[in-house]
Amino acid sequence: MLDKFDNLFHAARTGDISLLQKLLNDQIEINIQDNRGYTPLIIACYNGQTEAASKLMEAQADVNAQDFGGNTALMGVSFKGYADIAEMLIAHGADLNMQHGNGGTALMFASLFGRNELVKILLKHGADTSIRDKRGLTALDLAIQQGNEPAIEMLQLL
């Protein structure tokens, strides 16, 4: 059984769609977590595997699953800058305002790392700009710290 799960994580990480489809057809448990709490969906999203992420979402993967640090797939793509995957996650019900262990949100990641297309997408879909992390900082505060002028402008318009 472990081999199937190793294969599932491999298919998600590398975008091996034929292997992924075979495993999905076998009705494998798709919300299994590895030793860091990553699910196949989190792995696919973090690695920019759009088609694999789409297949997993179609198979009802939990879009709000959190790893052991509290990070979600949406947080991962907001950090990495994968706008197309972010839109898919949101369309499948991803919670825009979930917070990880330190209180950060997807919007905070996008603001902090200059992923301004993601800032725009998250704001368009109603991300809460008033959420504060454990240090008391908002997405705007983080954008200011980084000198991220486009994000500052978008966040100040609200």
Name these PLM-found stretches:
Residues 19, 51-52, 84-85, 117-118, ...:
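Conserved ankyrin/ankyrin-like repeat signature
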